[in-house]
A protein has these predicted regions:
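A broadly conserved detector of short glycine/acidic/proline-rich loop/turn motifs that flank catalytic sites
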Residues: 10, 47, 86-88, 123, ...
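Compositionally biased, charged N-terminal/linker segments
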Residues: 1-37, 131-138
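Short, charged beta-turn/beta-strand-edge "cap" motif at the junction between a beta-strand
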Residues: 45-51
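Charged phosphate-binding loop/patch that engages nucleotide di/tri-phosphates or the phosphate backbone
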Residues: 115-138
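Alpha-helix N-cap/loop-to-helix boundary motif
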Residues: 27, 33, 51-57
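Surface-exposed, flexible loop/turn segments at secondary-structure boundaries
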Residues: 12, 49, 71
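Aromatic- and Lys/Arg-enriched surface recognition patch
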Residues: 55-122
Length: 138
């Protein structure tokens, strides 16, 4: 099992949660294919909207990749099903020194520019607890 951090503005995250899907890096297939059923997924949203949204810098949704193959939507974008759990949006700032992904890295924002990053179980568990989604790690 792997854990993924996907970087998407909050408005798109909320739409994905509503639809029960994940779509990464503008809907390309490669990122979606790396995910497998049971993988953890957490969204980080630097802004509320893109490109004109307000700064946010929060983890905005969390769940697990569902047992369904990726599919291409009617608009040509690749998606996977996700089972999201209720969670509270959580700022990243208080966690920067605790997360293996960002600890000791002043330029952690550059990592996020990749759009999809594999994260450790430690980081996924910490984020899940902070978001009140402990059921994902129990």
């Amino acid at each position: 099992m792997k854990n993924w951090l996907c970087v998407v503005q909050r408005s798109h995250v909320l739409r994905g949660v509503e639809l029960g899907i994940v779509q990464t890096n503008h809907g390309v297939k490669s990122g979606i294919q790396r995910m497998t059923p049971g993988d953890g997924l957490v969204y980080y949203s630097p802004k509320t909207d893109y490109p004109e949204g307000d700064a946010l810098r929060e983890f905005t949704a969390i769940g697990t990749v569902a047992d369904r193959e990726p599919w291409q939507s009617e608009t040509g974008l690749w998606r996977r099903a996700v089972t999201y759990v209720p969670a509270t949006a959580t700022p990243i700032a208080p966690l920067l020194d605790a997360l293996e992904l960002t600890r000791g890295n002043k330029n952690w924002g550059f990592i996020m520019r990749r759009g999809q990053v594999e994260i450790s179980q430690h980081d996924f568990s910490l984020i899940a607890r902070e978001m009140g989604a402990g059921s994902l790690i129990e």
